[in-house]
Amino acid sequence: MPLMGSLYIGASGLQSGQNALNTTAHNLTNIDTTGFTRQQTLLSSKRYITISKNPAAVSDQQYGIGVNLSAVRQVRDYFLDQTYRKESGRSMFYEASTDVLGEVENVLGELNGEDFQTSLSNLWTAIQELSKDPSSSVTQGLLVQRSAEFINRANAVYQDLTNYQDNLNKQIKEKVTTINQYGKQIQALNDQIRKIECGGIEHANDLRDTRNQILDELGKLCKMTYSEDSLGNVSVRIEDSDFVRGDLFYEIGLDASDATGFYTPFWIKDAEYTVLADGTKKYNIKGAEVFNLDQTVSSSLDTDIGGLKALLLARGDHRANY
């Protein structure tokens, strides 16, 4: 091998080592960055030069010309990503449900320093006393007093529960807005990643980190599945319906009930509509709802995934009439 060839081999090793050190420095710099994925440098040998061929020999006489930086890849596990996002969605479902139950317990148990059960027990005691002596003006007056107390407390409980329903309705609107924002961001990142990686030379690791972080957050809000194609596009489905497909984004709309003002998430792409005189669209969301709330909540059926679905179930679709 010529002297310059030997020097080139050494230079390629130094250059590849420098690239590996740069990757290590990048990992250390971003160790506390949310969503960052550790990167790994892959090295491979450059092509070999054949000196001579001998059919009787085990192999040809060759020598290498150095080492090459093959790729800088992310160290991620697709199976673990899918499992984490699914289970984080299930965790958020039960966390949201627990928060709602806790709030209802507070309304029933911490009303003005005295729980609702006390007023109910006092009313029942007054009725029992009246049954012993119906002609007694004292027991009659006590029943009237206890009844008034019970009605006042019942009205207060009803108002608190109604206000909490409105609060849940507001949270539902905010979460749908957040989901749509995530969809637009994934669509934009798909476009950027595709442009960078189309030449087969560069790998958009930092953009992929951002997209993976968005998928992590999206998995907490709803039941979603995703897949990546050969171009680097990630397609996302929510509740078995397309949400992002390549460079396409399908928005989730909100239909407000005329009677209650409660929002129902629906797929705009699947809903029929009529154009009103003022130019606005009136949607018919039948069959276009994002969530089927009639399904039995079950881990075996995967119907207990996503904080948004938990809020919809907790809020209900009507106001109670007590």
Task: Give the location of each predicted region.
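Structural signature of extracellular appendage/secretion-system components
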Residues: 1-322
